Amino acid sequence: MTERSEALGKDGNRRWDDKSDHDDVTKIYVNYSLMGIESIRFDYVKSGKPIEGPFRGETYNTYTHTFEINHLKNEHLESVEGSYTQRGIQTLQFKTNLRISEPIGYPGKDGIKFILAVEGKKIIGFHGSTYFRLYSLGAYFTRVTPTRIEAIGGKVGTKWDDGVDQAGFTKIHVRSGQEGIQFIKFEYVDKNGRLRDGSIHGSIYRRGSPHVFEIRHVDKEYLVSVEGYYDGDGDCAVIQALRFRTNVKTSQLMGPKTGKKFRLAASGMKIVGFHGYAEKNLTSLGGYFTPIIPTKSECQGVTERSTLWDSGAFEGIRKVSVTWRSYCIRCFRINYENDGKVVKRAHGMNDDSRITDEFVVDYPYEVITSIVGTMNDSYVTSFVFKTSKGRTSRTFGERTSDSVEFVIESKGCAVVGFHGWYAPLGAGYITALGAHFYPMPLPPAAEKLEAQGGAGGVPWDDGSNFERVRKIYIGTCEVGIVSVRFLYENDIEEIVVGDHHGNKNLLRHEEFDLDNACEYLTSVEGSYDVIPGSEDVEVILMLKFTTNKRTSPCYGLDDDPTFVLHKAGHRIIGFHGKSSNMLHKLGIHVLPITDP
């Protein structure tokens, strides 16, 4: 059911309406000047097809700001905040379930604030009015439907569905037996914060092994995935084992590793409900998922007679840079991670004549978890950043005698954005600071070992989301290794084909095949040197691979190894490196070797 809000602002003489027959808003274009928001345009998506909307208002002599919403990653527009005067809409700021845009426009002294939002719903269309510029804005809302992943396993027994009216889980009860999972039961917290005891799905009238997995919902712990095994033919299959993972911890495997492996998970989302089939055993299990939502802290510092700024929320932070003088922070710069791209933001006055230093974060293996700062009655005087690896940055600025300490953090969360205030009229110093937080995921289980080889080439990384290496393709020529390509196996036994790294037009091509699930890669030997006839181009000359069972032939030139990629007690599950039309460097991702 679609809900239409009233258009807020001043009434312009040209009314417009984008209607509500869209699935999501995908991109917003805002043209603005000192007079206010001059024009606006919205792009939408409907049944997977993009729809470009027209500009509403005039576009002469304006600044332009765009804000993209990635509906393919379950991002949707939740609200619009702004202000208006007699001259129309002056400022706008857009909030999705994942991020917040920068404030757009220039706030007037007598501006009236407004917000377009309906709890539990998303915006799918806009309407409003113009009179040369944008005068009013309203929206269409529809309910956000959780993503349903169909039940995996058999379909024998009673179909059950716990629904999606819960905010999270507190406890999961499972009993396993010789024939599979006998029953499962969930304890929930509803959206009003009340505990709710779920129904038993399966049979309780047999002996088995009980398992209980507790989830601390009050500490912002939430369920992100379920994996397990099912065995049997078609609709008669039975769930044999289950393992639950939250953003904080992973349960033991409840039951034996028997049959085919499966996983219930969705990137950037958490589980809010389950459904499936059960008879005397649990025969199948499916889930409902909703996006994980960032939170915003209050600002620490002085907000009076200052200008508001807000970077919004991103995937992570790669680097912070701070410029300061003896008594205040002058400029705060942040490099954010946004879907594989670096987004740069700067707040305050960029003054290169002052002291500047930076703090680099090893994202995604490291995140900022808190900021310890000091402030006096006028401005922020110092910052210190702390990370998930236990690192602490230097002190940016000075802790003066009249300063008071403050801490910005949210337990179990990572900092994914900053907001605050700075002094106007050319002063530029930071007067207040706050942060956007996102529940902290488990750090990548794999360890990334530094690549070995020569300089040159473009970086590449196959990642570490694999269980083992299945096959290696090596391209060689008379001067060394031309290219490599790896086939991997993921945790549900699917084959993942990696990219070609190097020259695809191979002169000679060789393969090294790992036999079965019991064989895994433990080390790589290699050598590198300058290409004959070149002064500085270093390439990999030779590679040799060792598994827990055997050693491969020597690929490339017959050369003595100059490096070894290996970590004791670990197996190789991924590769990274640098390449051009040759292979320049090679590195590995490793996991600890565990008993089968």
Swiss-Prot record:
Which residue intervals define the domain Jacalin-type lectin in the entry? 2-143, 146-291, 294-439, 446-592
- Record SMART domains: Jacalin
Q: Does the keyword Repeat apply?
A: yes
Q: Which InterPro entries match?
A: Jacalin-like_lectin_dom, Jacalin-like_lectin_dom_plant, Jacalin-like_lectin_dom_sf
Instruction: Return the annotated region ranges for Disordered.
Output: 1-20
Q: Please give the Gene3D superfamilies that the UniProt record associates with this protein.
A: Jacalin-like lectin domain
Keywords for this entry?
Answer: Lectin, Repeat
Q: Which domain of life is it from?
A: Eukaryota
MF-aspect GO terms: carbohydrate binding
Stored PANTHER family: JACALIN-RELATED LECTIN 22-RELATED, JACALIN-RELATED LECTIN 3
Q: Which family does the UniProt entry place this protein in?
A: Belongs to the jacalin lectin family.
Q: What is this protein called?
A: Jacalin-related lectin 46
Species, as recorded = Arabidopsis thaliana
Q: Which gene encodes it?
A: JAL46
